[in-house]
From Swiss-Prot:
GO terms for cellular component: cytosol. Monomer. Binds 30S ribosomal subunits, but not 50S ribosomal subunits or 70S ribosomes. The gene is rbfA. It comes from Burkholderia cenocepacia (strain HI2424). Belongs to the RbfA family. It comes from the Bacteria. Residues 113-132 are annotated as: Disordered. This is Ribosome-binding factor A.
Amino acid sequence: MSRKRTSPNRNVQIADQIQRDLSELIMREVKDPRIGIVTIQSVELTPDYAHAKVYFTALTGDPEKTQEALNHASGHLHNLLFKRLHIHTVPTLHFHYDQTIEKAVEMSRLIKEANSTRAKDDDEADTPAKDD
């Protein structure tokens, strides 16, 4: 007898549904003052749906305190998800601050700085030296 395998597409669909539901639940159900305005960026599920890495950004507040508060509320959020999702296993939630935006801004700054240094060096090379 063969076991029924879940398709990778199903994993993505469930992760997307968890992302949508968590966004709503955090906004409406979690009353922790350490959690400001939070955006759930993505959810990564393990193949057996036992664990989910939830990546978020915080528009307001300290990201570390927000992460701590979200992980503290993860049990409550897990129970609320269990009532909404119609799947056998609702994953244990692990919240992680998504630093992608900060890294992109820093990378852009470094590129801009490198380009301006390069342009300055090119200008100095093109300018003839003055004879004293």
